[in-house]
């Protein structure tokens, strides 16, 4: 077990005893914080922010200095990897990412690089080094990547459109070519995440944002299969320390039992899933992350406290729960409500850990 002043995130991910439920928030460093906006202005654009270690590390540390969070997460974007593979991507304010030349043929796929993280993604690794030094073993650092399926959705479609008709047509018209692309992305992710681990991250999350648009059969073949391959090839134990892995498939609550067989340590839920149901599905063998609706943070303190207590009570007693939102925090969320949520989770969860049946 890795040593930190506050190791509750790692302990919960591994279903070990804790004194209170840990919390971190998806996009915890983001536009809702004026401090983030200030740092963002120092970069030419979002991509430049991600590629400047001094700035990206500062961005990652903003919420850690502002709130009593139990884990930090690197500041980057899932589409940094396709960019390193040779694709041109732009991030437009309020419109999202866009690829200038989306993949449209097998030759496009063959022309993609499998990037060497030490060369093509060094700015991410350098940011990790800076963050780890600043954290000074106070709390763990989370690294991440998008899932192969989710990255392929953007790379083929060119932008987010919620339907992703081009890649879904490929399933039925050019499945061999699609699997070729997914394998190349998978190999790139394995190298990327293992480099993150070498440089100091203590846990990994795979964000499968668009896995939920598939049928169960296609999800298992085109998304879950490749995430399982990633997990099997990660340095899940590095320098004697277990590196817990989380899978987050948005709108994938119906596949919890299948995800639990992937080799992951934690399943992250969106807000559409009942957390009590999810815990029963994994039978205490996998930790659960989640799963407050981000819109709850627009409510009053009393309503936030009520919903927090509801989620904690539904999960119930003992460890294995990491509190978080069911997706990323919204840009106009009141920071004082975020602080209240964190304090509420810490205070209200203590009673659920007094008699812990898991190993210490």
From Swiss-Prot:
Report the SUPFAM superfamilies cross-referenced here. Answer: UROD/MetE-like
Q: What is its EC number?
A: 4.1.1.37
Catalytic reaction annotation: uroporphyrinogen III + 4 H(+) = coproporphyrinogen III + 4 CO2
Domain of life, per lineage: Bacteria
Question: According to its UniProt record, where is this protein located?
Answer: Cytoplasm
Coarsely, its chief localization is cytoplasm
Root EC class: lyase
> What pathway does this protein act in?
Porphyrin-containing compound metabolism; protoporphyrin-IX biosynthesis; coproporphyrinogen-III from 5-aminolevulinate: step 4/4
Q: One GO cellular component term, please give it.
A: cytosol
Q: Name one Pfam family in it.
A: URO-D
Cross-referenced InterPro entries, in alphabetical order?
Answer: UROD/MetE-like_sf, Uroporphyrinogen_deCO2ase_HemE, Uroporphyrinogen_deCOase
Q: Which cysteines are joined by disulfide bonds?
A: none
Q: Which GO terms describe its biological process?
A: protoporphyrinogen IX biosynthetic process from glutamate
Site positions per UniProt: Transition state stabilizer = 77
- Gene Ontology terms, MF aspect: uroporphyrinogen decarboxylase activity
- The keyword Lyase belongs to this UniProt entry's keyword annotation: yes
- What is stated as this protein's family in its record? Belongs to the uroporphyrinogen decarboxylase family.
State how it assembles. Homodimer.
Function recorded in the entry: Catalyzes the decarboxylation of four acetate groups of uroporphyrinogen-III to yield coproporphyrinogen-III.
The protein's name: Uroporphyrinogen decarboxylase
Please name the taxonomic classification of the source: Bacteria, Pseudomonadati, Pseudomonadota, Gammaproteobacteria, Enterobacterales
């Amino acid at each position: 077990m890795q040593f930190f002043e506050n190791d509750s995130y790692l302990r919960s991910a591994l279903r070990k005893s804790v004194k209170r439920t840990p919390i971190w928030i998806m996009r915890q460093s983001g536009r809702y914080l004026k401090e983030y906006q200030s740092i963002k202005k120092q970069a030419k654009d979002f991509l430049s922010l991600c590629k400047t270690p001094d700035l990206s590390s500062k961005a990652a540390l903003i919420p850690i200095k502002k709130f009593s969070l139990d884990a930090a997460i690197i500041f980057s974007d899932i589409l940094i990897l396709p960019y390193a593979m040779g694709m041109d991507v732009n991030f437009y304010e309020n419109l999202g990412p866009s690829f200038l030349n989306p993949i449209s043929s097998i030759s496009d796929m063959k022309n993609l690089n499998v990037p060497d993280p030490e060369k093509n993604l060094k700015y991410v690794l350098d940011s990790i080094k800076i963050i780890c030094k600043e954290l000074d073993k106070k709390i763990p650092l989370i690294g991440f990547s998008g899932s192969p399926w989710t990255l392929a959705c953007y790379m083929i479609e060119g932008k987010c459109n919620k339907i992703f008709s081009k890649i879904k047509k490929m399933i039925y018209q050019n499945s061999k070519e699609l699997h070729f692309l997914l394998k190349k992305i998978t190999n790139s992710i394995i190298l990327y995440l293992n480099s993150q681990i070498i440089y100091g991250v203590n846990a990994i999350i795979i964000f499968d944002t668009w896995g939920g648009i598939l049928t169960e059969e296609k999800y298992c073949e085109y998304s879950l299969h490749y995430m399982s391959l990633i997990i099997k090839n990660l340095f899940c134990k590095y320098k004697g320390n277990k590196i817990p892995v989380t899978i987050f498939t948005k709108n994938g609550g119906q596949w919890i039992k299948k995800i639990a067989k992937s080799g992951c340590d934690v399943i992250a839920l969106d807000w559409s899933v009942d957390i009590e149901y999810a815990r029963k599905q994994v039978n205490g063998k996998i930790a659960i992350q989640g799963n407050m609706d981000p819109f709850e943070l627009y409510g009053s303190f009393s309503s936030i406290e009520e919903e927090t207590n509801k989620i904690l009570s539904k999960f119930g007693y003992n460890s294995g729960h990491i509190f978080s939102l069911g997706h990323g925090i919204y840009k106009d969320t009141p920071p004082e409500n975020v602080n209240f949520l964190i304090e509420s989770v810490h205070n209200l969860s203590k009673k659920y850990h007094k008699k812990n049946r898991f190993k210490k």
